[in-house]
From Swiss-Prot:
It comes from Arthrobacter sp. (strain FB24). Pathway: Cofactor biosynthesis; (R)-pantothenate biosynthesis; beta-alanine from L-aspartate: step 1/1. This is Aspartate 1-decarboxylase. NCBIfam families: panD. One of its GO terms (molecular function) is aspartate 1-decarboxylase activity. The gene is panD.
């Protein structure tokens, strides 16, 4: 049996532009994609922290070092410039693979520059954010 598991995320990125008339997808700085182990064309879930919207789309590589997080096409009705978003990927794994897998969590600043890369999906590196109550640290699970 395979399980769908959390693979990686880019945490609390800022939308740099939203283009309603582009043909779908999300454009992401190539540095961020590589840091989060996300390929161009890969399926991502995007959660908008600002307004609660959630959607799925695919990635397009943006200019390296640009900090671009561009919401394209119909998704621009839901997510707007300066919204805070989380881009999440999942992967199919066997139970054994899932137990051994270490996810990638890329924390960024307001300019979408990497501030830390970790592997704990519940760890916050943004001022004012805390670990959710009762959430175990990854090391406590081993």
């Amino acid at each position: 049996m395979n399980r769908t598991m959390f693979k990686s995320k880019i945490h609390r990125a800022t939308v740099t532009h939203a283009d309603l008339h582009y043909v779908g997808s999300v454009t992401v700085d190539l540095d961020l994609l590589e840091a989060a182990d996300i390929l161009p064309g890969e399926l991502v879930a995007i959660v908008d922290v600002t307004n609660g919207a959630r959607l799925e789309t695919y990635t397009i590589a943006g200019e390296r070092g640009s900090g671009v997080i561009g919401i394209n096409g119909a998704a621009a009705h839901l997510m707007h410039e300066n919204d805070i978003v989380i881009l999440i990927t999942y992967a199919e794994m066997t139970t054994e693979e899932a137990k051994a897998y270490t996810p990638k969590v890329v924390h960024v600043d307001k300019d979408n520059k990497i501030v830390q890369i970790g592997n704990d999906p519940a760890e916050g590196h943004t001022r004012g954010l805390m670990r959710p109550p009762f959430a175990l640290n990854n090391s406590a699970l081993n």
